[in-house]
Amino acid sequence: LKALQGRLSELHNEVYRRRIPVVLAFEGWDAGGKGGAIKRLTQALDPRGYAVQPVSAPNDLEKSHHYLWRFWTAMPKAGHFTIFDRSWYGRVMVERIEGFCSGDEWRRAYAEINNMEESWANSGCIVLKFWMQIDKEEQARRFKERQENPDKQWKITEEDWRNRAKWDQYEVAVDEMLVRTSTTYAPWIIVEANSKYYARIKVLKTVVGAIENYLKEHK
C-alpha cells in the first residue's frame, strides 16, 4: 500500500507538470468501502491538487439545470484530480429504481453519459470508474458493525436499509449500467471489495497503471 501511494505521489507531480486532468468516480453497494478507498488515494496526493466531490440528491439550483450540469461544473482543472464519491450514475440506479426520473429519462441517460465521458477523454482527461462490489452477507455484517460502533453509527441510515431491501432491483440496474457504459475511454473497474485491504490495493494499482500508460502513450 505504502509503495503504491509513493508511486502515485510521484505521478501526481508528473500529471501536474503535464497538465493532465484526472477524473475518478466511485460507485458501489452501501458499505462497499468507497470512502476507505478514496481516503487511501488522497493520502498520496498533494492537497492543493485534488478535490473530493461527495454526491447526494441535487439541490434546487442543480435541479433547475440538466442533471449532468453539476458534474460538468466540478471537472478538474488541468493537472488536478477530481474524485467523485458517488456520481452521475445515480440517474440509472437510485433515480431509476425510486422513480425520481421517467423511464425515457433513464434509458436516454446511457448515451448522454457516454457522450459526456467521451468528450472529457477527447480533451485529454483520464477517466476511471470504480464499482465497489461486496456480497449481501458482507453488507449485512458491515451494517451491523456500524450500528454497534458509536463512532460509526452516523454512517448507517434508514435509507441504507431501504436500499438493501431492493437489492435484486439494484443488481439488475447495476448490471445494465456496467454493460452499457464501460468504454475504452472511461472503463468500469469492478473492485472485489469484501476484503477492504485488497480493494484499496486494487484501486491504487489501477490508478497508478492508468496514469503510467497514459504518460507512455502521450510522450
List each model region and its residues.
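Glycine-rich phosphate-binding loop of ATP-dependent small-molecule kinases
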Residues: L1-K219
